[in-house]
């Protein structure tokens, strides 16, 4: 706790007493340190450095092929650069006598190819974070990419439970059964406290939010408790433990963080993650300070704070001290040699693993797959993108090649397309697209086999059910955001976003869809890449009972029962080529496989498609210019919304009723006044 220094009042007697003490102490060799504090309060300073959503980006990236040690380049992030930035701030703060905490708000795992090492028995990310001196991390949704059992193995490999002494893993609203390894081995904790050098006691807890928990594919028996109720309990426990300052490490997103701050008093700081928001200024919700540092290690967050020992208030000091809230991690930072050595060690292991799972076709994450002079972009949000088209085309054409059967439609969700694909820009890397860049964008998840990446599944749906898919994606993106936006190959459609939802029932928060947000849908019947000019399309009509061959990410299929249980009018029945229903508990029957039984992964399809592009003069495949932009596959239009028509009809009805009532009253009055 804080020690409060008395405030001396200046008077003649006091000056005499002090003078006497100083004279005596000078003879006795006693040194007395008298501190003066402005005003009538004492403040204790401390600093929180923070990251979130680093997604296994151990090396500088975007593009990774541009990075060369010691050279200026446009690549961002990298654990060794980040470590240098942290060390520099720690050194400065140490000279000033100011303690520093280093925190990560989850999703340190999953996304870049280094995450694949988890399946090979390594815990690269967390071991490096320990070496960098992280005080605490929380568990996000992507730590569950390979399932709760694999997460437990990962934490054990990282040295837990003993490693809590280095880096606490806080997951306060996570509830694993007592016999599950996560709980049985004490692999996560509910709370933690840090006694800082200046006497300040900081309490911390970690939560995963509603949206983050919802997008986890597989948790087994692990459950997530109500975030707000858990937070209230954690705040109370930490106060009982004597915490001066309470920090919530939250993997929830800014909107949920603001809601948490409104609903749960006593949280001084929320260090956030999940929505990949770069907050260049802190958000103040009531008295709670909210921060977030973007994603992929592009920034290190720096939050300068002061704790008032008299009032218990915490205030932000960044503006007065002038450090930015976010520090770009770029080539201006050299690599910490110890951390860089660890990264290089794991890179060699990853290269050997890639050689194994690609049957020797690739043996280095920096192997060139193709070339382009443009970025295959994954933005803007909630819109057709060039990368979305490239990925879905890859899925459609490669499955067609694998099976020998025409694939009518391929679809993939934005949530599983992680990042734009950046070709190299330096003299040594110009135009190069490496294996790393492709897998970084498409290599999340795993299937039922032991290999990384989400498998591709093949289903047959009626034309009416394809319309249901379109209506469902419009509904999900409306309520749950960009991760649920679907990209398509072999199809184009137009829709009015204002018609996705007719209304929402307030008490149960249940959306009532119009099922008429899609204004038109067309199937591409030509060969090769679908045209931009409208040639080769036929209408895909509502009520069409013909079967169409659709391929998608198997993970995506698992969301169908969740939606159709709530909205049976949008029912989708997954079928095989003979039209026979195949329930999703038999999803293995729907997965596309190699001749040896291995699953065909999304990332594999994209790599195969990239290498199949026509070669340039240097013999390297060149990505078609078609993918430099979008192709008019998904078109947003604006028409008068259904709810507007409904309101208009109600107004007409009410007006008619009022008119009839007034007319009847007028008629009655006329009858009463008529002479007898």
Residue ranges and their predicted role:
Residues 1, 22, 151-152, 159-160, ...:
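Charge-rich, low-complexity amphipathic helices
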Residues 2, 11, 27, 37, ...:
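Intrinsically disordered, low-complexity segments enriched in small/polar residues
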Residues 2-33, 653-659:
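Secretory targeting signatures
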Residues 4, 120, 177-179, 266, ...:
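Short secondary-structure boundary micro-motifs
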Residues 13, 19, 224, 361, ...:
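Generic alpha-helix initiation/capping and coil-helix boundary signal
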Residues 22, 108-109, 218, 285, ...:
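General secondary-structure edge motif
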Residues 34-332, 387, 391-394, 410, ...:
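Acidic, metal/ion-coordinating pockets
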Residues 39-51, 56-60, 64-85, 131, ...:
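Catalytic centers of hydrolytic enzymes
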């Amino acid at each position: 706790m804080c020690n409060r220094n008395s405030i001396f009042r200046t008077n003649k007697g006091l000056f005499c007493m002090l003078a006497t003490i100083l004279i005596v102490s000078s003879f006795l060799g006693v040194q007395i340190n008298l501190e003066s504090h402005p005003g009538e309060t004492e403040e204790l300073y401390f600093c929180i450095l923070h990251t979130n959503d680093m997604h296994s980006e151990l090396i500088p990236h975007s593009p990774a092929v541009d990075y060369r040690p010691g050279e200026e380049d446009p690549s961002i992030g990298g654990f060794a650069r980040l470590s240098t930035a942290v060390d520099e701030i720690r050194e400065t703060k140490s000279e000033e006598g100011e303690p520093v905490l280093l925190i990560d708000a989850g999703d340190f795992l999953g996304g870049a190819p280094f995450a694949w090492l988890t399946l090979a028995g390594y815990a690269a990310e967390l071991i490096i974070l320990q070496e960098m001196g992280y005080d605490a991390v929380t568990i996000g949704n992507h730590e569950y990419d390979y399932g709760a059992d694999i997460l437990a193995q990962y934490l054990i490999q990282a040295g837990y439970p003993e490693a809590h002494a280095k880096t606490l893993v806080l997951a306060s609203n996570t509830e694993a059964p007592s016999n599950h390894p996560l709980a049985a081995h004490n692999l996560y904790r509910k709370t933690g406290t840090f006694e800082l050098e200046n006497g300040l006691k900081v309490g911390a807890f970690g939560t995963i939010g509603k949206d983050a928990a919802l997008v986890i594919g597989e948790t087994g028996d692990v459950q997530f408790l109500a975030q707000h109720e858990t937070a209230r309990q954690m705040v109370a426990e930490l106060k009982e433990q004597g915490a001066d300052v309470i920090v919530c490490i939250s993997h929830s997103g800014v909107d949920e963080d603001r809601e948490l701050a409104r609903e749960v008093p006593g949280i001084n700081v929320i260090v956030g993650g999940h929505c990949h928001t770069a907050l260049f200024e802190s958000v103040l919700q009531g008295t709670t300070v909210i921060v977030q540092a973007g994603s992929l290690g592009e920034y290190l967050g720096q939050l300068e704070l002061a704790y008032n020992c008299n009032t218990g208030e915490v205030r932000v000091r960044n503006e007065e001290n002038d450090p930015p809230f976010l520090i770009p991690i770029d080539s201006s930072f050299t690599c910490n040699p110890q951390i860089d050595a660890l990264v290089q060690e794991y890179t060699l292991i990853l290269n050997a693993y890639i050689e194994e799972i690609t049957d020797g076709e690739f043996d280095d994450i920096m192997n060139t797959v193709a070339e382009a002079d443009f970025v295959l972009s994954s933005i803007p949000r909630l819109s057709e993108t060039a990368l979305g088209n490239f990925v879905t085309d890859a899925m459609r054409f490669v499955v067609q090649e694998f099976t020998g059967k025409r694939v009518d439609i391929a679809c993939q969700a934005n949530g599983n397309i992680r990042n734009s694909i950046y070709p190299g820009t330096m003299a040594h890397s110009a135009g190069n697209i490496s294996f790393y860049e492709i897998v970084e964008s498409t290599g999340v998840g795993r299937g039922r086999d032991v290999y990384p990446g989400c498998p591709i599944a093949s289903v047959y749906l009626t034309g009416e059910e394809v319309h249901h898919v379109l209506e469902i994606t419009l509904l999900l993106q409306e309520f749950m955001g960009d991760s649920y936006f679907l990209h398509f190959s072999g199809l184009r459609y137009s829709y009015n976003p204002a018609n996705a939802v007719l209304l929402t029932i307030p008490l149960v928060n249940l959306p009532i869809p119009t099922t008429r947000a899609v204004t038109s849908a067309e199937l591409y019947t030509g060969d090769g890449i679908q045209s931009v000019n409208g040639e080769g399309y036929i209408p895909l009509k509502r009520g069409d009972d013909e079967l169409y061959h659709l391929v998608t990410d198997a993970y995506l299929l698992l969301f169908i029962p969740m939606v159709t249980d709530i909205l049976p009018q949008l029912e989708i029945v997954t079928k095989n080529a003979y039209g026979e229903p195949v329930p999703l508990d038999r999803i293995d029957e729907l997965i596309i496989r190699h001749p040896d039984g291995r699953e065909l992964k999304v990332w594999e399809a994209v790599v195969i498609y990239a290498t199949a592009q026509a070669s340039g003069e240097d013999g390297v495949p060149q990505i078609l210019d078609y993918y430099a932009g979008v192709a008019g596959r998904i078109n947003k239009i604006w028409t008068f919304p259904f709810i507007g028509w409904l309101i208009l009809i109600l107004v007409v009805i009410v007006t008619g009723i009022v008119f009839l009532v007034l007319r009847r009253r007028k008629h009655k009055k006329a009858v009463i006044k008529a002479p007898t």
